[in-house]
Amino acid sequence: MMKFMCIFICAVAAVSASGYGGRRPSYGSAPIGAYAYQVQPALTVKAIIPSYGGQRGYGHNQGGYEAAPIASAYGNADIGNQYGPVSGSRYGGAPPVDREAIALAKLALAAPSAGGPLVWREAPRRVQHAYGPSNYGAPQQRYARAEEAQGASAAAASSSVAGVAKKGYRKSSY
């Protein structure tokens, strides 16, 4: 899926950056390919910045956008004669969205590592046992956990109940 997305973005960048079909209306004054190029991982190495005049930009003779090192786009450094300083007439500087994106990227890289993934630990579930008739209309009788007979006491209780059922009801003579 990632490979497909990269191929699609590159195709959009190539189509909108080419001069085929003359000057087309696009997003603002920049062709969409200029923004699609910045989505690529090469953002850390190069940026597309406006170039005015000359025959080197994506817009050919009418200016347009050109790939240049990030340092020349976001700093005042002069990167040789090829790119020149940012404040010159050749480059118009980076759009404010790009400055914000770079600032957020630097902030994210400076943040401490989050560590391992968060593990959700559920509390143990308590199952309520229901005894009595299983008819849909009849209410079920529920016993508290302390009232349930367990182990030997369950056997004793059942034998005493079975004995009482055969002999009938008797008063205890205390």
Swiss-Prot record:
Disulfide bonds: none annotated. Residues 1-17 form the signal peptide. The keyword Membrane does not apply. It is found in: Secreted. Its main location: secreted. Pfam families: Chorion_2 (PF03964). GO terms for cellular component: egg chorion; extracellular region. InterPro entries: Chorion_2. Keywords: Secreted, Signal. Residues 154-165 have a biased composition (Low complexity). It comes from the Eukaryota. The keyword Signal applies. Residues 154-174 are annotated as: Disordered. Chorion membrane (egg shell) protein; plays a role in protecting the egg from the environment. Belongs to the chorion protein S15/S18 family. This is Chorion protein S18. It comes from Drosophila subobscura (Fruit fly). The lineage of its organism: Eukaryota, Metazoa, Ecdysozoa, Arthropoda, Hexapoda. The gene is Cp18.
